């Protein structure tokens, strides 16, 4: 087909002829020239076609460049993989001078991508980035400038940005999400492969670009590389210690000849090293006074130079960063404002007026030096003067004051608990008022008791007993030594009072004991201290007995009529015809236990009403008031005998009283046994005659109301205090048997047994009994072991019995006046022995004690047999 009919005569067809000569080049169809005199050799301006105003459909309407192959070769970039001109392509000249040409294949590639055309990594990353840009722009359509701003950290070159703008010129101001995916694909290919993107690259998959790490160095100043060590240096032994190779040797067991070395590429960073000079120079600080003097001398020598210097200083501005003294000197040198600084601060002299004023105020200037602070207010005046740095003037023979330095005193401890240390110091000063020696040495801190005042009272009550005229200097000299810390009891004051009153066992009863006894026997509250004052029983009254003082209010009403000189006596201190006498010839092998911390079943047998005693057991406490008030409104022998006859305590009633004991007692016998018990009771006259016949039947051991817990005097000894106390704790366990319902009704009957707790209810010890009787008694005791096993085992833990001499009871000077009351008391003793016989300790080392134990055991066996009618 020929296009010659289009040729119009008269027109310049040179361009067309040239185009016809090149049909074989394959640059396009035959040229149809619409040239109207435009110079085609001139470079085409980018403003010839309004690229921004064209839409996506206008891409086919492009200006065709029909130039030679040289112009077509310039359309492609040097870095582009395709070096041939695309057939039927589009050639564009960018503003940077590069020519961009789009082939028909490029024109067929869409500028948008769907999610199906992306990889999973691209979808996940590009969607996140798109949402980030939308959040910043507050819209769903983004611009290319927003994308480039978001990709600032990727360091895109300007050529890449221009090429992408040229490709997406139709939608550069409004990119949807598909076009955004296409833009990022071209950006990733340009960043990773370092080429200018083309339109056809949109369909090619590309990895996701990763930004430059923040911590990475721009120029890679430091590079760590492995360097092999030289064998020659290793052989010489001059190499440094390589901790990395040593660590690898410990971990892997192999030695490595490589080490990591840091190599700095940038020369600027190589020079930055800290170097220490081996030569250290010292320079004295400048002396300002010397400089000023030198300057003044120089100015005197050269006054013209001084004026010039002043002029230069006046003209130059002040440097306010100078130190204050130099700045003041500069201001003084200027002398422009005389009111600001008249003279140098160091050169100001005191005037005569100022000197006179200071002389007048000299006395008042030292007023505030003697003010006592909070710390010095509690110190004596001498220490205050020492603290303020002054010395005390002391006058000597010539009346001249010589300063004397007093030694510093150590800090004294402050008692945070009770006032033990304070009272102890005051008490010691009262005991030793004439101690002229002043202890100036450092004293150790003394312990302060945070509990009760046991240690305090113990130390103060022991001091009067140990003070002797000859021992005064010894106490003074020993007080300066280091004393070990002494324990302080945090419980009750029982152990304290026991230790202080127990040394008075062998002393006669003093008037103080008489006064305490008479005052305390008139009220039920003071029954405990009455037994404290006895020579043998030194249990104190507990501080916790106050809640139980009102247990028996009826006793307090009847008690004033019950006081009788024949019957108000304690265990070892008795009132005989109005006189208080002690039991004669009572030997104590040990003192009494340290504390009254026995269980509840044992506290009913103590000699002072303690805190854990029920009401039905309190009637058996060892107090004359509790003994006689309920059973004896009037103390007469006939009335006492009738009362005791009516209130004979059966084993059942006794078992009621002992319901708190840990030992398992036998169950109460049937009522028929009680009737047999009444028939088997020996009359008081017969019992009293038996007591008269037996010389060694002496009330030696107190009957603590059917309790086997306290059977020996060693139980109350301070030497065995800890052992006895812990044994009593270990042996105590609550009784599984409940309290019978008739416990309250037996209270009156139990009170009659309280008299026996006053007396010494150990049975008569016959010294003439043989060893065969002891063997028989042991056999019988084994039969009773299951019944009274707990009692016998605990009794054997406390060796020792109280004995009197074998002399006749009538031959003793302090024989108690029994009468009918004595018969009654011994009858109750016999009855209580029948119910709960007390065993003696078999573990006594002395032979006499063993013999006494044999006799007591035999007597108990006889009492048991009489009780159960096994022997006529």
Curated annotation (Swiss-Prot):
| The protein's role, per its UniProt record | Regulates both fluid phase and receptor-mediated endocytosis. Involved in vesicular transport at a late stage of the secretory pathway. Regulates actin cytoskeleton organization.
- What post-translational events are described? Phosphorylation by PRK1 and/or AKL1 on Thr-416, Thr-450 and Thr-490 of repeats 1-1, 1-2 and/or 1-3 negatively regulates SCD5 function in endocytosis and actin cytoskeleton organization.
Q: Does the keyword Repeat apply?
A: yes
- Phosphoprotein found in the keyword field: yes
Subcellular location per UniProt equals:
Membrane
Annotated motif KKRVK motif, positions:
272-276
Its quaternary organisation is:
Interacts (via KKVRF motif) with phosphatase GLC7.
Q: Where are the sequence repeats?
A: 405-424, 439-458, 479-498, 534-545, 564-575, 593-604, 608-619, 623-634, 636-647, 650-661, 683-694, 717-728
Q: Which UniProt keywords apply?
A: Endocytosis, Membrane, Phosphoprotein, Protein transport, Repeat, Transport
Tell me which residues bear Phosphothreonine: 416, 450, 490
Q: What is this protein called?
A: Protein SCD5
Give all Phosphoserine modified positions: 564
Write out the ranges of the annotated region (Disordered).
Answer: 1-98, 209-239, 280-321, 338-358, 460-489, 516-571, 591-620, 649-681, 697-758, 806-838
Composition bias type Polar residues, residue spans: 48-85, 284-296, 339-348, 462-481, 594-620, 697-727, 746-758, 806-815
Q: Name one GO molecular function term.
A: protein phosphatase 1 binding
């Amino acid at each position: 087909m020929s296009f010659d009919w289009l040729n119009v005569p008269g027109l310049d067809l040179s361009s067309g002829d040239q185009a016809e000569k090149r049909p074989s080049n394959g640059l396009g169809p035959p040229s149809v020239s619409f040239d109207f005199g435009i110079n085609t050799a001139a470079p085409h301006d980018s403003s010839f076609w309004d690229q921004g105003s064209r839409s996506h459909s206008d891409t086919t309407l492009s200006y065709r460049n029909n130039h030679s192959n040289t112009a077509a070769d310039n359309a492609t970039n040097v870095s582009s993989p395709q070096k041939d001109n695309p057939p039927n392509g589009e050639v564009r000249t960018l503003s940077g001078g590069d020519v961009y040409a789009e082939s028909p294949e490029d024109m067929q590639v869409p500028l948008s991508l769907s999610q199906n055309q992306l990889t999973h990594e691209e979808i996940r990353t590009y969607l996140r980035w798109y949402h980030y840009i939308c959040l910043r722009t507050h819209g769903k359509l983004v611009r290319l400038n927003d994308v480039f701003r978001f990709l600032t950290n990727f360091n895109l070159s300007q050529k890449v940005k221009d090429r992408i703008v040229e490709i997406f010129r139709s939608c550069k101001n409004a990119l949807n999400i598909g076009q955004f995916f296409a833009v990022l694909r071209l950006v990733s290919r340009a960043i990773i492969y370092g080429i200018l993107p083309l339109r056809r690259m949109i369909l090619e998959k590309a990895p996701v670009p990763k930004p430059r790490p923040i911590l990475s160095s721009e120029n890679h100043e430091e590079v760590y590389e492995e360097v092999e060590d030289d064998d020659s240096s290793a052989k010489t032994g001059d190499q440094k210690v390589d901790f990395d190779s040593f660590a690898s040797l410990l971990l892997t067991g192999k030695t490595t000849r490589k080490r990591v070395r840091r190599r700095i590429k940038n020369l600027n960073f190589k020079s930055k090293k800290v170097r220490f000079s081996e030569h250290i120079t010292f320079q004295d600080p400048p002396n300002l006074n010397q400089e000023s003097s030198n300057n003044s001398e120089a100015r005197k020598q050269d006054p013209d130079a001084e004026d010039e210097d002043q002029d230069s200083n006046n003209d130059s501005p002040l440097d306010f960063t100078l130190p204050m003294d130099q700045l003041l000197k500069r201001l003084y040198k200027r002398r422009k404002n005389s009111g600001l600084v008249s003279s140098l601060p160091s050169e100001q002299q005191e005037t005569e007026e100022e000197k006179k004023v200071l002389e007048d105020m000299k006395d008042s200037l030292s007023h505030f030096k003697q003010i006592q602070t909070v710390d010095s207010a509690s110190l004596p005046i001498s220490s205050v003067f020492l603290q303020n740095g002054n010395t005390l003037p002391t006058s000597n023979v010539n009346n001249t004051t010589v300063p004397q330095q007093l030694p510093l005193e150590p800090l004294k401890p402050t008692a945070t608990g009770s006032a033990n240390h304070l009272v102890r110091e005051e008490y010691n000063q009262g005991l030793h008022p004439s101690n002229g020696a002043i202890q100036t040495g450092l004293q150790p801190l003394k312990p302060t008791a945070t509990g009760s005042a046991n240690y305090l009272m113990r130390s103060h009550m022991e001091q009067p007993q140990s003070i002797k005229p000859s021992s005064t200097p010894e106490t003074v000299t020993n007080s300066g030594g280091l004393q070990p810390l002494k324990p302080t009891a945090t419980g009750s004051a029982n152990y304290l009072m026991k230790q202080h009153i127990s040394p008075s066992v062998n002393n006669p009863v003093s008037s103080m004991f008489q006064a305490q006894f008479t005052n305390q026997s008139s009220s039920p509250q003071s029954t405990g201290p009455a037994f404290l004052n006895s020579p043998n029983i030194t249990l104190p009254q507990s501080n916790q007995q106050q809640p139980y003082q009102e247990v028996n209010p009826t006793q307090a009403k009847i008690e004033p009529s019950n006081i009788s000189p024949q019957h108000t006596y304690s265990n070892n201190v008795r009132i005989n015809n109005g006189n208080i006498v002690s039991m004669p010839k009572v030997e104590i092998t040990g003192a009494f236990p340290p504390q009254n911390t026995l269980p509840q079943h044992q506290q009913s047998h103590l000699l002072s009403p303690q805190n854990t005693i029920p009401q039905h057991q309190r009637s058996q406490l060892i107090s004359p008031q509790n003994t006689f008030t309920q059973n004896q409104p009037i103390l007469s022998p006939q009335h006492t005998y009738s009362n005791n006859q009516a209130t004979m305590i059966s084993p059942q009633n006794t078992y009621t009283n002992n319901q708190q004991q840990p030992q398992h007692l036998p169950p109460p016998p049937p009522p028929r046994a009680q009737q047999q018990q009444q028939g088997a009771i020996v009359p008081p006259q017969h019992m009293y005659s038996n007591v008269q016949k037996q010389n060694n039947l002496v009330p030696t051991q107190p009957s603590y109301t059917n309790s086997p817990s306290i059977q020996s005097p060693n139980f109350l000894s301070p030497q065995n205090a800890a052992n006895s106390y812990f044994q009593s704790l270990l042996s105590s366990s609550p009784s599984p048997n409940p309290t019978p319902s008739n416990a309250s009704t037996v209270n009156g009957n139990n009170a009659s047994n309280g008299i026996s707790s006053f007396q010494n209810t150990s049975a008569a010890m016959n010294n003439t009994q043989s060893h065969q009787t002891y063997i028989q008694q042991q056999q019988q005791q084994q039969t009773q072991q299951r019944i009274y096993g707990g009692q016998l085992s605990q009794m054997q833990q406390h060796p020792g019995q109280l004995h009197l001499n074998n002399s006749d009871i009538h031959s003793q000077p302090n024989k108690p006046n029994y009468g009918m009351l004595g018969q009654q008391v011994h009858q109750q003793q016999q009855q209580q022995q029948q119910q709960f016989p007390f065993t003696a300790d078999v573990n006594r080392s002395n032979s006499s004690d063993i013999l006494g134990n044999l006799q007591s055991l035999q007597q108990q066996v006889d009492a048991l047999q009489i009780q159960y009618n096994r022997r006529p």
